[in-house]
């Protein structure tokens, strides 16, 4: 039987994932800043895990083990997010302000909305890929949460962003083509990396704002 503590934590996490970012006026009090951060972190963690699982399943199914390392060091695995001033780890993220990290996170999330909108049409023969039809909705939800955080930190008046919007190519539906397999492999690798960055940024912001004891990650 699961202990009361872990079970309560899981129930709280599930409840937070089910919460909308904003409430109707007069229905419930608006979500606190700490609640917005907690919700965003949970959603980013969930998406990052889903991206990692999908990448591993694709790799196991389609990419021979002997070719994986060499492919990941080619242009196929190059991510456009590497061309923007995005921190590559927790220490670098600590040097950025919360709004800078939120703007970078928003850019990363928005760059995947187009490619992921039809992801389920590409991957249809796997239990992992079977969840892909909801990835777009989950990503839109995280985008909404990041925008809500930006509104809170900017006193409800978001400033015009200075970041160049860019998007990844769409996934290739021709899974019988080697070129398509390599392209999709590279895209899934980038998606996993970008979600890891987004999760890291949100956790850094949450930890330094609220001084939690469990900030080590």
Swiss-Prot record:
One of its GO terms (cellular component) is extracellular space. It is found in: Secreted. Disulfide bonds join 79-190, 207-215. Zn(2+) binds at residues 46, 199. Belongs to the somatotropin/prolactin family. PANTHER family: SOMATOTROPIN, SOMATOTROPIN,PROLACTIN. This is Somatotropin. It comes from Cervus elaphus. The gene is GH1.
């Amino acid at each position: 039987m699961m202990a009361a503590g872990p079970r309560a934590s899981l129930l709280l996490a599930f409840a937070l994932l089910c919460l909308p970012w904003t409430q109707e006026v007069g229905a419930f009090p608006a979500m606190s800043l700490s609640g917005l951060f907690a919700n965003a972190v949970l959603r980013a963690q969930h998406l990052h895990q889903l991206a990692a699982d999908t990448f591993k399943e694709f790799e196991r199914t389609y990419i021979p083990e002997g070719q994986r390392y060499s492919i990941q060091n080619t242009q196929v695995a190059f991510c456009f997010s590497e061309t923007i001033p995005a921190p590559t780890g927790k220490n670098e993220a600590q040097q950025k302000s919360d709004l800078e990290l939120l703007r970078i996170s928003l850019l990363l999330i928005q760059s995947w909305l187009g490619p992921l909108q039809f992801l389920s049409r590409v991957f249809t023969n796997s239990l992992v890929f079977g969840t892909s039809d909801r990835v777009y909705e989950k990503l839109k939800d995280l985008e909404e949460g990041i925008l809500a955080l930006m509104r809170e930190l900017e006193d409800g008046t978001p400033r015009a962003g200075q970041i160049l919007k860019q998007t990844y190519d769409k996934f290739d539906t021709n899974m019988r083509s080697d070129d398509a397999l390599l392209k999709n492999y590279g895209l899934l690798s980038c998606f996993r990396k970008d979600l890891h960055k987004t999760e890291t940024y949100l956790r850094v912001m949450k930890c330094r704002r609220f001084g939690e004891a469990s900030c080590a990650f």
